[in-house]
């Protein structure tokens, strides 16, 4: 389960138009969330609130042997008015879904909308005006062409927003903070810090400089822990990356190219469009280099990913391959959205030096049933009336035929109640499971009860059937 502050931070990225998917460290994000999802330990309660469009708070209390907790505060310079903050209104897929579909790449002059209209995300479609997303302060930017590709960085500075976040852990008195500052449409800087007595020099600071041009993304980092210097990069090609001027809110060339062909080429156009829809996706290749200035050691890795795009009409899938040539590790993952309610993922690790290998599989299964009904196979609690059959055409009566006339008009039927329809957020919960080569299993059920979002899970070791349960926990969140 994503924490409320992570949900708000993602909303900040969406409001400012920053694409978190276009980074090298997010290459394996889909399979990682489907397989390595965290399991709750003990009992943990979280109370959160988006008090104003600019300010959010969160209080957490947990018990794992000892009672601990944390206090969090977040401030955003841009009003976050386009999201649902109440726990009874937050779309569950936006908070719990693990399969992450890539967002469309935007050209340098276009406004980004990360909270897209993907039906699988559970999020509302992008607003029709910049006022609905950026507030009244963006009217001048709209007049200057913010949505038409004009240069508005100097006009109003809508891309120069910032986010401040702080969290205090009790009773350890550990303090962490984060500052996100957007300088231009393509440049963003993050500074993260942790202060704790047990750490070297009493704490550590991590600085990130991120540069995103859509077709490629670069990232430089420095950490005071070991004097680590690093550089990461990701380059995209194929799909929407092949055209830097592709408008994400207009049909892709593979969908409507037949409208520009003459009648003699309709068949060829349909075949080409169908072929493009069948394999329409984006390739990404990248790598990272890092060096520790204190311990005089370094490392590197290379990676590649293919993922289908939202315009793809077939089965959404993501495949990745990463290699660490110095350590000899090869990692391959494959994830797909088998159905709208079912996602599957698998991962294989192999070391060319030791010949050791590991594998793991994971899945998430969404349901519109309560937990008990889901496990017992009961019918869903939402009863949807079947669609009425179309009325049959009534023949003329015998009397009307004898008198060579039409039947008298029938009285208007009484209005019938509108049948129930499925809501956008029809799911009541999701079951997540994973299994690795050591026969360690993780089970997690996440859902909503009234205004509470809960997560209950356990870790099971099948090698120790006498004491199989390794962990058990319950986490409850409430936000207003």
Curated annotation (Swiss-Prot):
Pfam family, one: MDM10
Topology versus the membrane: Multi-pass membrane protein
UniProt entry tagged with the keyword Secreted: no
Domain of life: Eukaryota
Keywords: Membrane, Mitochondrion, Mitochondrion outer membrane, Transmembrane, Transmembrane beta strand
Record's compositionally biased regions (Low complexity): 256-270
Compositional bias per record (Basic and acidic residues), positions renumbered to this chain: 386-408
Coarse class of the protein's main subcellular location: mitochondrion
Subcellular location: Mitochondrion outer membrane
Cellular component annotations (GO), alphabetically ordered: ERMES complex; SAM complex
GO biological process, alphabetically ordered: establishment of mitochondrion localization; mitochondrial genome maintenance; mitochondrial outer membrane translocase complex assembly; mitochondrion-endoplasmic reticulum membrane tethering; phospholipid transport; protein insertion into mitochondrial outer membrane
Keyword Amino-acid biosynthesis listed: no
Positions of region (Disordered): 245-272, 377-429
InterPro entries, A to Z: Mdm10
Domain comment as written in the entry: Lacks alpha-helical transmembrane segments, suggesting that it resides in the membrane via beta-sheet conformations similar to those predicted for other outer membrane proteins and porin.
Function: Component of the ERMES/MDM complex, which serves as a molecular tether to connect the endoplasmic reticulum and mitochondria. Components of this complex are involved in the control of mitochondrial shape and protein biogenesis and may function in phospholipid exchange. mdm10 is involved in the late assembly steps of the general translocase of the mitochondrial outer membrane (TOM complex). Functions in the tom40-specific route of the assembly of outer membrane beta-barrel proteins, including the association of tom40 with the receptor tom22 and small TOM proteins.
Family: Belongs to the MDM10 family.
Subunit structure: Component of the ER-mitochondria encounter structure (ERMES) or MDM complex, composed of mmm-1, mdm10, mdm12 and mdm34. Associates with the mitochondrial outer membrane sorting assembly machinery SAM(core) complex.
UniProt protein name: Mitochondrial distribution and morphology protein 10
Organism lineage: Eukaryota, Fungi, Dikarya, Ascomycota, Pezizomycotina
């Amino acid at each position: 389960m994503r924490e409320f502050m992570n949900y708000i931070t993602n909303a900040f990225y969406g409001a400012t138009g920053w694409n978190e998917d276009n980074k090298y460290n997010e290459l394996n994000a889909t399979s990682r969330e489907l397989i390595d999802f965290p399991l709750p330990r003990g009992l943990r309660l979280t109370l959160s609130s988006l008090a104003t469009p600019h300010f959010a708070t969160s209080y957490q209390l947990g018990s794992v042997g000892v009672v601990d907790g944390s206090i969090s505060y977040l401030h955003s310079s841009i009003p976050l008015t386009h999201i649902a903050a109440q726990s009874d209104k937050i779309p569950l897929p936006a908070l719990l879904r693990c399969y992450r579909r890539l967002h469309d790449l935007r050209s340098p002059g276009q406004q980004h909308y990360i909270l897209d209209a993907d039906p699988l995300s559970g999020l509302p479609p992008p607003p029709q005006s910049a006022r609905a997303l950026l507030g009244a302060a963006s009217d001048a930017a709209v007049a200057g062409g913010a949505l038409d590709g004009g240069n508005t960085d100097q006009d109003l500075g809508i891309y120069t927003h910032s986010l401040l976040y702080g969290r205090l852990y009790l009773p350890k008195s550990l303090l962490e903070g984060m500052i996100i500052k957007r300088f231009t449409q393509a440049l963003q800087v993050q500074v993260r810090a942790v202060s704790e007595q047990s750490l070297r020099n009493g704490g550590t600071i991590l600085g990130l400089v991120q540069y995103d041009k859509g077709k490629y993304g670069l990232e430089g980092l420095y950490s005071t822990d070991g004097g680590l210097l690093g550089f990461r990069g990701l380059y995209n090609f194929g799909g929407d990356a092949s055209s830097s001027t592709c408008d994400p809110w207009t049909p892709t060339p593979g969908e409507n190219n037949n409208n520009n062909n003459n009648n003699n080429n309709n068949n060829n156009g349909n075949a080409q469009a169908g072929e493009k829809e069948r394999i329409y996706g984006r390739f990404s290749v990248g790598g990272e280099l890092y060096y520790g200035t204190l311990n005089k050691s370094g490392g590197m890795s290379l990676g590649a990913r293919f993922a289908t795009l939202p315009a793809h009409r077939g089965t959404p899938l993501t495949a990745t391959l990463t290699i660490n040539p110095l350590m000899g590790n090869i990692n391959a993952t494959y994830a797909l959205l088998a159905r709208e309610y079912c996602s599957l993922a698998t991962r294989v690790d192999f070391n060319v030096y030791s010949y050791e290998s590991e594998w793991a599989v994971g899945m998430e299964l969404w349901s519109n049933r309560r937990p008990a009904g889901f496990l017992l196979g009961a019918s869903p609690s939402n009863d949807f009336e079947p669609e009425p059959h179309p009325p049959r055409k009534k023949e003329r009566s015998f009397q009307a035929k004898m008198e060579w006339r039409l039947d008298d008009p029938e009285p208007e039927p009484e209005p019938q109640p509108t049948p129930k329809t499925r809501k956008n957020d029809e799911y009541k919960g999701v079951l997540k499971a994973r299994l690795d080569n050591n026969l360690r299993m993780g089970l997690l059920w996440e859902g909503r009860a009234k205004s509470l979002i809960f997560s209950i899970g356990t870790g099971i070791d099948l090698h120790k059937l006498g004491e199989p349960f390794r962990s058990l926990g319950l986490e409850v969140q409430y936000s207003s």
